Amino acid sequence: MVYISNGQVLDGQSRSPWRLSFLTDMFWGITDFVVMFFQSIIHPNVTRRGCQNSSSSTRYDDGRGPPGHPRRMGRINHGSGPSAPPMAGGGGUGR
C-alpha cells in the first residue's frame, strides 16, 4: 500500500510483515479467540458484552408477557361419551 510520510511517497511493501506490533496483535487476537472459545463451551450465554440472559434483556420487556395458549378451532370435543343429538324437532315430551 502506498502512503505519504514527511512529504515522501513510501511503499508499504518495504515494511516487514513480522514487525513487533503485528506479532503482538496476532498474539492477542489468538489469545482472545481461545479464551472466548472455551468460555462459550463452559457458559454458552456469555458474549464479549456479558451474559445475554440477564433480566434486563428478556424478549418481553414491553410489558406484554409471553404469548398465551394456542386457540382451539372447530367444535369443543372433550372426548368423553357420545355427542349430543341434533336439536331438530322429532320425538319429544308431548307423545
UniProtKB/Swiss-Prot annotation:
Keyword field contains Cytoplasm: no
Regions that span the bilayer: 20-42
Region (Disordered): 47-95
Keywords carried by this UniProt record: Calcium, Calcium transport, Cell membrane, Endoplasmic reticulum, Ion transport, Membrane, Selenocysteine, Transmembrane, Transmembrane helix, Transport
Pfam families: SelK_SelG
Subcellular location as annotated: Endoplasmic reticulum membrane; Cell membrane
Protein name: Selenoprotein K
InterPro entries xrefs: Se_SelK/SelG (IPR024491)
Keyword Cell membrane: yes
One of the GO biological process terms: endoplasmic reticulum calcium ion homeostasis
Membrane-related topology note: Single-pass membrane protein
Principal location class: endoplasmic reticulum
GO cellular component entries: endoplasmic reticulum; endoplasmic reticulum membrane; Golgi apparatus; plasma membrane
Homology family: Belongs to the selenoprotein K family.
Primary role: Required for Ca(2+) flux in immune cells and plays a role in T-cell proliferation and in T-cell and neutrophil migration. Involved in endoplasmic reticulum-associated degradation (ERAD) of soluble glycosylated proteins. Required for cell surface expression of CD36 and involved in macrophage uptake of low-density lipoprotein and in foam cell formation. Required for palmitoylation.
